[in-house]
Each structure stands twice: as structure tokens, then as C-alpha cells.
């Protein structure tokens, strides 16, 4: 027994000595991890800094398959970036969160987070504890939201001019900015058609379908009150149906097939003839039942098991003057039903007249040489939905136009959610910096120091805007500070004229929700990165 004890005590002593050394060595580790996380996250923020604002640059992104995307939308750039570091990935998630919450300001939110992290580095190097920094940042955030809310002015949804200005400001920083005079009214009209301005508190953007069609230019984009389908009409003879009765089926109009492991053996031609006769009678019966309900436009869901529509069925439908559109995607069905008031039918026995939707006109429109579209307009019981048709000379332009329209729609959605506007052009951030610096003087000790650092970090937005517009960032931000100190709350960077002016007179406005959401999400992310002191890899 005693001989067993001796080594144990030795081991304990060794372990204690080892632990002492380990504790000494590991004391630096949390700080190293923190700095590593901060520098990785800052690298992501620096990567998209140049794409902020109307004079920001675009990024060309090539994926593994060789597909190219050209965009300056922060969320899109970060989504497609290959980010390995877990802390850097948090900034990608941050941008996604801002995209979901507000839909705009996805670049700003990451830049603000990067700047706050930069301030954290300086504070940590001075030996301030991460928890103190984190709590001070939370205080600064609460005060910041108050300041932004004070700066904002209420807006009514009936004030169309203001809504247009907000949408135009959002579109001005995009590749398609020269078309903002067309796309802004289109976005405003689309949102206003799908909500009741008096009672709405949010907008479901799924009610606004964006259909992309190659060919033409962005000038050819249009807003359609009704349904637009890119699928071709299957029977060539019928391209226009007035007083349309529209049915939507989820079963196939073709001969039934046997199960996978069954076979039918046909031994002579008389039996073959009988099989064909049966098939003909079966399909004719299906088509007659469809015709009996008064249906004259038939939409057929895409089927992967067998032909959704056989040639024989198409022949009969053609004879009965029924327009047929096949290969309707499963995910479009809900939108189609809401738009034209039809109900999907899974079996022929349920195909009755009350399942049909009705519309004034279903017409296949020829797009002078670049394909065809099917438009169904004048729906009798329209749900509140609209379709935006986006045209463009190539895939890159169309996709960027779609993203830009989505951002403009999101800006108007923000105004529906929170009916307040704030100036753009870096004005709110400079005001924040100024007022938070004043606020920091009322605090004592380390808190005051940390809030001051938070305030200084806010200046990154006007500084980046000035830099991207080719102005001198230091002199521009200094002048802005002076103007705000003299009480000009709405002085901001006028990128078009290359100077500082009252940004509200230039109609550069953004929803309050975008700024508040960006500030809140950026601060939350920075606080979580600060609190991390170790990264553990698991198998």
C-alpha cells in the first residue's frame, strides 16, 4: 500500500508544478484568442468596406462552377465568400440577420461591427476587462437608439413622395442606379398593392413575385397586377382566352403506368389494339370531365414520375379549345392559388366548377424576339399579390436588378413596420458620435472611456462614404463634426456634389428601422465576440 502512495504524491506535486506552469503559460491564451477573433472579423469588414455608398465599388464573385456574380450588396458578397474562421463567419451571419430584419444596410452593419472591434482592440490593449467593455457598449447602444429615434421624423404611408425618396436612396448605391426613376415607383406601387396602408404593420414579400426573363433592357421591366408565367403554352393554336376559367391540377393527363416491378405481356395485335383503345377512352374521359366544369385554361403541375401531359391528351384539349400550361413548379402553386383564387386538385373526381379561378384575360405575350410570357390579368377574386417582370440583356444584369428591387421593397417594408425616417449620408452616425461623446462625460471611470470609444467607432460610416467618393476622409469628417456641433443635425456627405450639405434637402433618406437594426445587431455581435476566450474544435 505505502509504495503505491509515494508515486501518487509525486504525481500530484508534478501536476501541481505543471499546473502552475500551465496557468502561467495559458494566461495569455484568452487574450490571443480574442485578438485572433477580432482580426479575422475585421478582415471580413475590410473586404466589403469599398462597396459602401453610391460611389462604392462592385465585387465580381466566381463560384466553384465558374458562375460569375457582380454585386455590391453586402449580404450577397458575404454569402458567397468562403470564410473559414468561426469569428469571421459570425460577421457573415450578422449580415444575413440584417438582410432578414431590414433588407438594407447589410454592408453598413458589417463595417460598424468591424469598427467597434477595432475600438475593442485598443481598449483590451489598455488592460480594460472584456466584461466592462461589453456592458459599456450595451449602455452606449441603448443611448444610441434614443438618439436615433429623436433624430427621426414620422412618415405616413399616404406620403408617396417620401416612400419614393427612400426607395431611390436604396437603389442609388446599386449597379442599376440609373434606372431608379423606373424601379422606385414600381417598388412602391408593388408594396402598396399588397397591403392595406391604414392597418398594415408588415409586408409579406412572398406576395410580390419577381419573374426574370432574359432579353430587352431594364427599361422593359413592368409591374403586372395578376399572374405572369414563364412556361410556354403547350398547344400552339390557342394563345388568348377571354373570360378565363382557370383550373390547376396536380395529377397527370396520361395513360396510367404499372408499378415498377409489374409487366404487361401483350401476345397479339388484337390485345395491343385493346390497350391503345382503353388508353384513348381513359384520357378522353379525363378531358371531358375537365371540359364539363367550364374550364378553358388548365395549369398542370410538373411531374417527375411520368409525362404530366401525353400527346393524346394535348390533342383532345386542343380540340376542346382549352389552353394548357404544363410544368408548373411546386413552389409556385401557393402564389398562383392566392393570385387567381383557384384551388389545386389532386384527383379528377374533385375537379369541380367551384375549384376554378376566373380572370378577364389569359394571354401569351410575345416579347419581340426574346421568348414569350403568359399573363393572366383581371382576376375576379384577386388575393393581394402582384408580379414584377424583370428584363435585362444578360443574366448578371437581371440578377443584380432583382437584388436591387428586393432591397427597395425591403426599405418600404421597413417604413410599414416602423413609420419613421432618418437622414442618410452618414448624418445619423456623426450625430451618434457627437451625442455619445457628450453622454460619456456624464459617466465615470472605465465606462466613460468605453462609451467614448464606441462613439469614435461610429465615424467609420461617414469616413468610408467620403473615401469611396474620392473625398478626403479626415477633412470631411472633421467638417461634418463641426456642422453637427453647431446644431445641423441633418448635415451629411453629399456624394453627388462631392461636399457636405443638408442631406434631407437632397432627399437622401432611409428608414429608422435600418439604422436601429444595424446598430443593435452590430453591437450584439461585437459583444459576443468579446466574450469568447477559447475556441474548441470537436470531432
UniProtKB/Swiss-Prot annotation:
Binding-site residues for Mg(2+), renumbered to this chain: 104
InterPro entries assigned to the protein according to its UniProt record, in alphabetical order: Chap_CCT_delta, Chaperone_TCP-1, Chaperonin_TCP-1_CS, Cpn60/GroEL/TCP-1, GroEL-like_apical_dom_sf, GROEL-like_equatorial_sf, TCP-1-like_intermed_sf, TCP-1_chaperonin
PROSITE patterns named in the record: TCP1_1, TCP1_2, TCP1_3
Protein's cellular compartments: Cytoplasm; Melanosome; Cytoplasm, Cytoskeleton, Microtubule organizing center, Centrosome; Cytoplasm, Cytoskeleton, Cilium basal body
E.C. no: 3.6.1.-
GO terms for cellular component: cell body; cell projection; centrosome; chaperonin-containing T-complex; cytosol; extracellular exosome; melanosome; microtubule
Pfam families from the UniProt entry: Cpn60_TCP1
Residues where ATP binds: 53, 105-106, 174
Residue numbers bearing the Omega-N-methylarginine modification: 19
Positions carrying Phosphoserine: 36, 184, 202, 444
Region (Disordered), start-end ranges: 1-29
Disulfide bond found in the keyword field: no
Residues where ADP binds: 53, 105-108, 172-174, 425, 510
Biological process (GO), any one: positive regulation of telomerase RNA localization to Cajal body
A GO molecular-function annotation: ATP hydrolysis activity
Catalytic EC class: hydrolase
Reaction(s) catalysed by this chain's protein: ATP + H2O = ADP + phosphate + H(+)
Residues found modified as N6-acetyllysine: 21, 288, 302, 319, 326
Function: Component of the chaperonin-containing T-complex (TRiC), a molecular chaperone complex that assists the folding of actin, tubulin and other proteins upon ATP hydrolysis. The TRiC complex mediates the folding of WRAP53/TCAB1, thereby regulating telomere maintenance. As part of the TRiC complex may play a role in the assembly of BBSome, a complex involved in ciliogenesis regulating transports vesicles to the cilia.
Family the entry assigns: Belongs to the TCP-1 chaperonin family.
Subunit details: Component of the chaperonin-containing T-complex (TRiC), a hexadecamer composed of two identical back-to-back stacked rings enclosing a protein folding chamber. Each ring is made up of eight different subunits: TCP1/CCT1, CCT2, CCT3, CCT4, CCT5, CCT6A/CCT6, CCT7, CCT8. Interacts with PACRG. Interacts with DNAAF4. Interacts with DLEC1.
NCBIfam families: chap_CCT_delta, thermosome_alpha, thermosome_beta
Protein name (Swiss-Prot/TrEMBL): T-complex protein 1 subunit delta
Species assigned in the record: Homo sapiens
Gene of this entry: CCT4
Amino acid at each position: 500500500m505505502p509504495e503505491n502512495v509515494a508515486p501518487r504524491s509525486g504525481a500530484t506535486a508534478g501536476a501541481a508544478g505543471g499546473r502552475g506552469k500551465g496557468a502561467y503559460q495559458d494566461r495569455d491564451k484568452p487574450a490571443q484568442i480574442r485578438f485572433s477573433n477580432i482580426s479575422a472579423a475585421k478582415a471580413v469588414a475590410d473586404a466589403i468596406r469599398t462597396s459602401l455608398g453610391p460611389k462604392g465599388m462592385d465585387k465580381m464573385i466566381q463560384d466553384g462552377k465558374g458562375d460569375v456574380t457582380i454585386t455590391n450588396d453586402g449580404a450577397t458578397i458575404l454569402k458567397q465568400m468562403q470564410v473559414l474562421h468561426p469569428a469571421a463567419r459570425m460577421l457573415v451571419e450578422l449580415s444575413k440577420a440584417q438582410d432578414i430584419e431590414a433588407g438594407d444596410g447589410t454592408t453598413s452593419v458589417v463595417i460598424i461591427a468591424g469598427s467597434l472591434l477595432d475600438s475593442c482592440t485598443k481598449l483590451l490593449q489598455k488592460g480594460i476587462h472584456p466584461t466592462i467593455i461589453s456592458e459599456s457598449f450595451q449602455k452606449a447602444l441603448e443611448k444610441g437608439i434614443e438618439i436615433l429615434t429623436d433624430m427621426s421624423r414620422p412618415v405616413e404611408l399616404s406620403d408617396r413622395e417620401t416612400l419614393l425618396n427612400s426607395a431611390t436612396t436604396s437603389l442609388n448605391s446599386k449597379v442599376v442606379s440609373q434606372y431608379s426613376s423606373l424601379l422606385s415607383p414600381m417598388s412602391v406601387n408593388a408594396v402598396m398593392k399588397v397591403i392595406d396602408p391604414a392597418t398594415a404593420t408588415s409586408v409579406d414579400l412572398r406576395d410580390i413575385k419577381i419573374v426574370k426573363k432574359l432579353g430587352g433592357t431594364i427599361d422593359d421591366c413592368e409591374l403586372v397586377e395578376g399572374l405572369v408565367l414563364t412556361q410556354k403554352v403547350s398547344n400552339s393554336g390557342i394563345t388568348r382566352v377571354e373570360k378565363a376559367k382557370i383550373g390547376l391540377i396536380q395529377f397527370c393527363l396520361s395513360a396510367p403506368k404499372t408499378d415498377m416491378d409489374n409487366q404487361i405481356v401483350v401476345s397479339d395485335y388484337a390485345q395491343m389494339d385493346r390497350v391503345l383503345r382503353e388508353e384513348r377512352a381513359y384520357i378522353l374521359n379525363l378531358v371531358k370531365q375537365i371540359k364539363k366544369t367550364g374550364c378553358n385554361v388548365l395549369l398542370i403541375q410538373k411531374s417527375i414520375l411520368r409525362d404530366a401531359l401525353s400527346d393524346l391528351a394535348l390533342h383532345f384539349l386542343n380540340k376542346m379549345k382549352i389552353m394548357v400550361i404544363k410544368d408548373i413548379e411546386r413552389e409556385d402553386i401557393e402564389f398562383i392559388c392566392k393570385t387567381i383564387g383557384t384551388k389545386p386538385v389532386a384527383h379528377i373526381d374533385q375537379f369541380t366548377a367551384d375549384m376554378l379561378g376566373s380572370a378577364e384575360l389569359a394571354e401569351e405575350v410575345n416579347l419581340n424576339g426574346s421568348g414569350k410570357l403568359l399573363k393572366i390579368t383581371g382576376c375576379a377574386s384577386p388575393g393581394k399579390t402582384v408580379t414584377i417582370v424583370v428584363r435585362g440583356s444578360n443574366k448578371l444584369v437581371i440578377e443584380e436588378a432583382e437584388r436591387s428591387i428586393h432591397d427597395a421593397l425591403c426599405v418600404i417594408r421597413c417604413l410599414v413596420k416602423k413609420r419613421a425616417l432618418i437622414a442618410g449620408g452618414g448624418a445619423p452616425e456623426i450625430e451618434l458620435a457627437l451625442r455619445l461623446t457628450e453622454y460619456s462625460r456624464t459617466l465615470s471611470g472605465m465606462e466613460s472611456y468605453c462609451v467614448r470609444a464606441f462613439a469614435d467607432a461610429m465615424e467609420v460610416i461617414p469616413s468610408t462614404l467620403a473615401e469611396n467618393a474620392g473625398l478626403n476622409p479626415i477633412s470631411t469628417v472633421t467638417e461634418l463634426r463641426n456642422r453637427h456641433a453647431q446644431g445641423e443635425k441633418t448635415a451629411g456627405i453629399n456624394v453627388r456634389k462631392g461636399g457636405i450639405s443638408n442631406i434631407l434637402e437632397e432627399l437622401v433618406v432611409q428608414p429608422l428601422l435600418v439604422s436601429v437594426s444595424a446598430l443593435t445587431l452590430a453591437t450584439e455581435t461585437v459583444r459576443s465576440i468579446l466574450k469568447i476566450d477559447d475556441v474548441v474544435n470537436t470531432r
